[in-house]
Amino acid sequence: MDRFQTKRKTYSYNGYSNNDYGYYNNNCSNVNYNNDIHYKNNNYNNNNNNNNSNSGNNFNNNNNNNNNNNNNNNNNNNNNNNNNNYTYGNNNNNNSNNNNNNINNNGNSNNNNNNSNGSENNYFQSENQSNKDQNSYFNSSYLRNPVDNYNHNNNNHNNNAFDNNNYNTQNLGDYSYKNDGYNNDNNNNDNNNSYGDTDREKYSIEKICNENDYDSVNNNNNNRNYSNSYNNNNYNDGNNNYNSNNYNYNNNNNNNNNINNNNNSNSNSNSNSNSNSNSNSNSNSNNNNYNNYGYNNHKSNNGGNRYSDDDDNVFNNNNNNNNNNNNNYNNYNSNNNYNNDYDYNDGKRANIYSRNNSNNNNNSKSGNNNSNNYNHNNSNNNGGYNNYNNGYNNYNNNNSNNSNHNSSYNNNNNNNYNNNNNNNNNNNNNNNNNNNNNNNNNNNNNNNNNNNNNNNNNNNNNNNNNNNISNNSNNNNFNYNNDNDRNNSNGNYNNNSSNINNNNNNNNNSNSYHNSCISYSNGGSNSKNSNKNNYNNQQSNANGNHVGNSKNNESCNNTNTNIEKSNKSMWDDENDYYKVQVGEYLNNRYKVLCTVGSGTFSTVVECWDTNSSGQVAIKIVRSAKKYTEDALVEIDILRNLEKTGNSNGKYLSHCIRLLDSFLFKDHICLVFKRYGLSLYEFLKKNRYRPLPLSQIQNISKQLLTAIYSMHKLSLVHTDLKPENILLESSRFTYFDNSIPLQFKNSIDTTSNNSVDHYCHLVDTDIVVIDFGGATFENTHHTAIVCSRPYRPPEIILGMGWSYPCDIWGVGCILVELYLGYTLFDTHNNVQHLAMMEKVMGPFPNSMSNVSKKYFNDYGTLNRPQNSDEIKSMERVEGLKQLKEYFHPCHDSFFDLASRLLEYQPSKRISASDALSHPFLFETIENDCFGPI
């Protein structure tokens, strides 16, 4: 139904277009898991340590035993790869201490806690200094709705990981524009607005699915000491040696508490282990989505096939390459980053978010059937921690047979215990690939762990059996990872994590429930958790289809395809659309009469409401998580807009009115009044002839009223276009030879557009629809919004955006109704800017100086160099100045249009001022069509 797709892409701009982004954290493998949570946090947590990778490793290893320091001295002469290698070697040297501590676990627990706290306090001091730098950075620009910064050394990496409300802004006149996608590295958390603690997740959820409010900070208490507990262990805390994995370092603190609690340790570790793992998955998933057009897909709901953004793709791909290199560098130095998945395209930052998923890909590529179990936590036994680790795994396997709770606890702890050992193998591969000089070191590590690998592989077999019993569905879910899918859905990683958590909840109610778009949970009612799991499983399975279709995920296609077939609901098609059956009843109330059409967001059906005995239109949203979340946002916005009506109950905002909403077979359904054609459909039916000026005047009043209502709620629609404006009814009359005199001069009676096909609207009442991409002003702003022909220049130039982007869209729509065709009909940025310059005149210096990509040093637009772009510029030459498109007697309308299409957002007319413009109140005497 849509004629073009809106590309919601995030691209690097002023702040981190090349090497700035996240590179500061690469020098310290000690805190790489901070990378998973928040790249910007790492930049500042590592400032005290990142003179080079050697010093970073020295920092951690100085806290190790003397034997480790000897190794440190030996390896300082090597390059970064060797340092990483030696770091893992030191970890192996600590195995004996760790094993001894494990043997005497109960007796040594207090001593280990004392030692752990000592190193923890020392690291807090360094961490605090880093956070001073970080705070000074964030405070250098205005913090909009700053989050809790009371203790960054404990809290930054989870609460501030979702820096949804930290925005760098620059004031452009009367408006404050977000530069999240350009100057603020916090934009890595782009989809946190979709999955995190912002308003986008809190919308009307309890009204739709009878769940609790979404709270993204839930269970983050377990993560308060996230980065600090990393150095708390430093591989010296023998009591916590099986938790030495970075990505669950919070378990060290929890386990210290467990030691104090004695018999309570198992249950506590169970919950904490899961919450840490899931939390990391969420945040890094969002980072990936942001840097790989995650929001692109979000906005593509509103698109079709009419336009494309090829130039945008090129622009963003370049920046993605920078991010890819960044990720490779991060993964190279991080203790737990598995680099094997970087054989794929597009720099998989998602590997950072879940080390188990990366291992899953490794096993998948080798065809090893252990891949499921390997990612099942207990099978991560490749190397390290010697024979005692095998015994420990066996001990945990026995526990897993006893109860699912113990199984979850032991799986996570085994995973933590073994992940560091896996680093030896994976980093050895890194060293072999990157530097032949490291071969000897790699061989030494392999020799140290050779026998252990064999023993651990045996344990893997045992763990596979136990895991298949207690967590069988988790095997599939870990294979259902989207590490290599960068161009599809926003929520792939969260969906995967959601699947993992859902299945764990089914087996183990104490697991933390992180990724549900409904609510967070720490157990509770079995039936309630089960419902949540089922609800999110469908969403996650839907995104699994995108993974299977991803070009970047070819080596995992077989696994993902199997998962799709096993988990895909029988009432959905392969693209997550509901398979509508004419005559069926939705929600035991609405009888389906016919299918009206389908878009990227939903399927629209016409139904008979058995309660009110009238026809309604029901939008059945696709079951994929990203579409479900957008629907929840839209529901909340529509309910708030309805409150803007006046006291007599008449709905004046001219926004579509929501009659009902419900969940039906894992699909959000929105019930509306049955409206008529969209403005675009009417223009098409009328063969793209212009509308009379009197009708444009009436539509202008209603459209500006709708925008004013939204802006009063601090809401930006972001996707105004004729397709998203519906007529209340489709009543119109056909003109034949009896055309009114004032119309004849405007109609070419000699063309193929015969006169008898001309349509004249009888009722011009309209409503604005499609609020799935609407954004509140105080929430995160993605870089690219608005459909291409209606996109304002500030978005193209990367200056940020706010309410004026809607005003520009209104101007484009009104001119299109006046002309009968799109004013800026283009598909790339260069041509788009050239069209604007041709129609509206040269850009002001405040805009031309922003981007050297599009403007030269003299402030004039750069001309294309390749033949395709040169050919595309030929269309620009056929355009006229805006004034030349307007009839001489329509000066008032021209004045309004030119003020709506003002270049500078700060000077662009507001919705409230536009409603007072003289054009909206004058009597139209010469009601002719369009331009002369």
From Swiss-Prot:
PROSITE patterns reported in the protein's UniProt record: PROTEIN_KINASE_ATP, PROTEIN_KINASE_DOM, PROTEIN_KINASE_ST
Could you tell me the Gene Ontology terms of the biological process aspect for this record? protein phosphorylation; regulation of RNA splicing
**Which residues participate directly in catalysis?**
D719 (proton acceptor)
User: What stretch or stretches form a coiled coil here?
Assistant: none
Q: CDD domains in the record, alphabetically?
A: PKc_CLK
Q: Extract the InterPro entries matched here.
A: CLK_kinases (IPR051175), Kinase-like_dom_sf (IPR011009), Prot_kinase_dom (IPR000719), Protein_kinase_ATP_BS (IPR017441), Ser/Thr_kinase_AS (IPR008271)
A GO CC term attached to the entry: nucleus
* Entry keywords, A to Z: ATP-binding, Kinase, Nucleotide-binding, Serine/threonine-protein kinase, Transferase
Residue ranges, annotated region (Disordered) = 1-21, 39-198, 212-562
Locate the compositionally biased regions of type Polar residues. Answer: 124-143
Segments forming domain Protein kinase: 590-920
Answer whether the UniProt record assigns the keyword NAD to this protein.
Answer: no
Where in the sequence does UniProt note compositional bias of the Basic residues kind? 1-10
Query: What highest taxon heads this organism's lineage?
Result: Eukaryota
EC annotation from Swiss-Prot or TrEMBL: 2.7.11.1
Regions of biased composition (Low complexity) lie at 11-21, 39-123, 148-196, 218-305, 314-342, 351-562
Residues annotated to bind ATP: V596, G597, S598, G599, T600, F601, S602, T603, V604, K619
- UniProt catalytic activity: L-seryl-[protein] + ATP = O-phospho-L-seryl-[protein] + ADP + H(+); L-threonyl-[protein] + ATP = O-phospho-L-threonyl-[protein] + ADP + H(+)
**Any one GO molecular function term:** ATP binding
Return the similarity comment: Belongs to the protein kinase superfamily. CMGC Ser/Thr protein kinase family.
Name recorded for this polypeptide = Probable serine/threonine-protein kinase clkA
- Source organism per UniProt: Dictyostelium discoideum (Social amoeba)
